[in-house]
From Swiss-Prot:
<keyword id="KW-0809">Transit peptide</keyword>
<dbReference type="Pfam" id="PF02410">
    <property type="entry name" value="RsfS"/>
</dbReference>
<feature type="transit peptide" description="Mitochondrion">
    <location>
        <begin position="1"/>
        <end position="32"/>
    </location>
</feature>
<keyword id="KW-0496">Mitochondrion</keyword>
<dbReference type="GO" id="GO:0140053">
    <property type="term" value="P:mitochondrial gene expression"/>
</dbReference>
<comment type="similarity">
    <text>Belongs to the ATP25 family.</text>
</comment>
<dbReference type="InterPro" id="IPR043519">
    <property type="entry name" value="NT_sf"/>
</dbReference>
<keyword id="KW-0472">Membrane</keyword>
<dbReference type="GO" id="GO:0005743">
    <property type="term" value="C:mitochondrial inner membrane"/>
</dbReference>
<comment type="function">
    <text>Probable mitochondrial mRNA stabilization factor.</text>
</comment>
<protein>
    <recommendedName>
        <fullName>ATPase synthesis protein 25, mitochondrial</fullName>
    </recommendedName>
</protein>
<dbReference type="GO" id="GO:0048255">
    <property type="term" value="P:mRNA stabilization"/>
</dbReference>
<keyword id="KW-0999">Mitochondrion inner membrane</keyword>
<dbReference type="InterPro" id="IPR040152">
    <property type="entry name" value="Atp25"/>
</dbReference>
Amino acid sequence: MLSNIWRRPKRLSFRYLAPIAHRSIAQTKNLVTKPENIRNTEGSENNDTVQSELPWYLRDDAASPLAETAQVELPEVPESAPKTINSFLELVAKDYGFDNLVFFDMTQLDSDHDYSTHHQPAKYILIASGKSEKHIMKAASQLRIHIKHTYDHLPSIEGMVTGGTSPRARRRMLRRSRKGPMATDNEYGKAANSWVMCETGVDGLFIHMLTADRRQELNLESLWCREEDAWRYEQQPAKAENSDHIFSGVRRFHTMGPFYMATKGKPLQKLLNSDSSIPGVELKGLISDFEKSGDSTSKFEFYRIIHLLDPNLVSLKSLANILISSKIPKIEAVVAYMKVLMDSQEIAAPEQTTAAMNESVDTRLDFLSQFVSDIYAYSGEQIELVGHPELVPLLWNLTVVNLKPHVIGSRTIDEAIHNEIEKEHFGNYPSVHIASNRNRDIYDLISSYNEAHSLTPTTSFKEMVLFTYGNAGKWDKFWSTFEVSFNLLNDQEHQTMTKWLRLVVYLDLRNDPVAINTFLNKYWSRSFPSSVTDLETRNFESEKEKDLFKTTIQSILQKVETPTSAEIQTTIDRL
């Protein structure tokens, strides 16, 4: 039955089309050979009718005249640039059809700029917009061939994806054919060849070819421009699109995060380091933009800056929740939170009174205790003081409140020894306040931990404790710490004059007459193991340190008068 219903049609043969073709050709000949159908050079009223009756392949070309090609404006090139730069500009604009060219001379950037020639290999950067991904791919291929034949080397091209598939890739895809597509196969709207970079290898020129949408999103110009031209490339936050596509949001958020801190985070950090302020309304706008970006990698850093600018917008509790929900190691989160506690205005002392500053230190430690309890809850882990090199110093500094912006520390001494610093920054008044009870508790905690684990405090930590007592004006503790911590009576570790050099440099910067008199009367005496006895048995690490020691002692002698000043000066002159 099925064979009667379903009959195979006869095979279509050319002989069925032959009569149709002959009739069409005959009609065409009649239309062309008739005198009334011959086109009049002066114009004929029936021309349109005749043209419509003719087959398409015999009609006159009715295309509209070509519009004048827009001239691409080439950017200005400095006279100091090589001649090859102009040739590449003309090649990209005129031969390859790119427009909106922007040229950056990286050699003219300041040495401290992040993208100056001191920090990266590019001397000149050209940015151009292509018409499509296919246009960019074709132009990049031609550019590679041009450089190969003109300059006799192959350039490095990144971001270009050709249509060809290597045999190795085909075999790999064949093996994966039964496993489904890889997650990386999804481009989330970032089409291949939307951004191609060519390192020409000619006079340090780098060429970036992008589609218009990709170029607007990346905003590469803001990275390489001068600071005074940054306003030219500022972009307004993109408005949310009303789309039913399932990746309408993912497409935008997929690569926006890393670029957010590059464009927004740096200005915020600079503002944080300056004395200027920013209105709360603008900060709320930045928070809204950041939430839309979906960036999770720099979330804590962003909100940390906002908190330091205005703690009313982001509280310490909110920062703690961000750290707890993040994926960073617990010990790293604790250190980051401790740094925030050091600078937070939310728990800062309202006035520089002993009671207010002690209460501020108590609040710091309470916040830290609660955070450590929350982040280590149900984990079965315990915080180790040696788990991070910054943990012990930060724990000590949490019990100290700075009274002045400039405080003498180990780094200050290093700068004074190796460079010249302005001593006017430091006065003879205490620059820090120590919460004595909490400070003693923390010191006992650190000492007990070291004793239980057979650890020895590092030299940097001992020096930090020493300078803290000196900065607070607690000279009794300062000298007792110096004798014990630096093992003055039986010093087998330090066989040079380095510790004495650092001590006299600190006393010179601290400029306290009481401390200077104690040093000259007690630690410059032959009746006690002192700097004088060490001068006879030990050497300086360099002649520069020796000269600095002499000039520093002379500076100290000018600040106070002691009966032994003449003897000390004689000893210094003999060095």
